Amino acid sequence: MKGKIFISFICALIFLVVTCAFLSHSAKEDKTKGHETAIQAAKEHGFASIDEVNTFYNRNVYYIIQGKNKKGEKIIGWMKKGNTDKILIKKAKEGLSKDDVLQLIQNIDNSKPKKIKKIMLGYDDTDSKKWDIPVWEVQYIDQQNRYTYFIVSFTDDRVYKMYSIKQ
């Protein structure tokens, strides 16, 4: 009797491990799906090397490609999923750096960060023409313990918006 219980336990444990491994692999694959297509398109649009590719979710899905052009200058590309013919490319020095954005949010009086969760390049494609632009998105916990999204234009630190949600 103890042998049957032990074998059943081992089988259940193996099933659980295999299921967890499958779910983990599937989730990771969804996160990086499309990166190879983005890399290929970026190379066709002037990227000599690729340092990083990230997926950004807004109204649409965007691939953010960071690398260098043939002159060795750091460049960033924003490509909408499924649109490999059109990539918005800017030199990194034309916009705000990650450090610039971190400094900017430290100066916000009513919503200073207590803990930064994530900072990443993205693309805001909301219905307003003002917001059809490359952006930096910062997710953080503010001093009032709210989960806050701070979205600022990649090229103009005066253009930003902020949302706070109670945890």
PLM features: what roles do these ranges have?
Residues 4-23:
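Hydrophobic membrane-insertion alpha-helices, especially the h-region
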Residues 12-17, 39-41, 76-81:
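Short amphipathic alpha-helical segments, especially helix-boundary/capping motifs
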Residues 22-53, 89-130:
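Short, non-transmembrane alpha-helical segments in secretory-pathway proteins
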Residues 44-46, 55-57, 140-144:
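Short, solvent-exposed secondary-structure boundary motifs
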Residues 51-96:
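Extracytoplasmic/periplasmic/luminal assembly and interaction segments
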Residues 61-67, 72-79, 100-163:
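Conserved histidines in hydrophobic membrane contexts and catalytic metal-binding motifs
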Residues 166-167:
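A short acidic/small-residue loop/turn micro-motif
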